[in-house]
From Swiss-Prot:
One of its GO terms (molecular function) is fluoride channel activity. Keywords: Cell inner membrane, Cell membrane, Ion channel, Ion transport, Membrane, Metal-binding, Sodium, Transmembrane, Transmembrane helix, Transport. Belongs to the fluoride channel Fluc/FEX (TC 1.A.43) family. GO terms for biological process: cellular detoxification of fluoride. This is Fluoride-specific ion channel FluC.
Amino acid sequence: MGPLGFVAVGVGAAAGAWLRWGFAVLWNAINPALPYGTLAANLLGGYLVGLAVGFFDTHAGLPPEWRLLAITGFLGGLTTFSTFSSEVVANLIAGDYGWAGLHLLLHLGGSLLLTAFGLWTYRLLA
């Protein structure tokens, strides 16, 4: 990746993170048990990555920096859930149902387990 790719990822990531933060500021306090801002960021990111993958797959002639800006940068900054979602859907479209299921299990189960482990580690060391 050249210098323009690094800039594209950085600018996109900053914009996505700012939007995610804005959602959190606006909506997370409404229901702390289910933070609506985080949910909105994840659901919007999942939807937008589907649109983006479809767009970039049909516009292969665009410079790769546009994809880096939109998907890796912006949607990665908005939520990593969008990347995860696109990977699972790609497996499903390819008919790789076992891989899609394993992807779900490892990402969701692993994230929950490691979050609990991180909390346990903090409490142990605090």
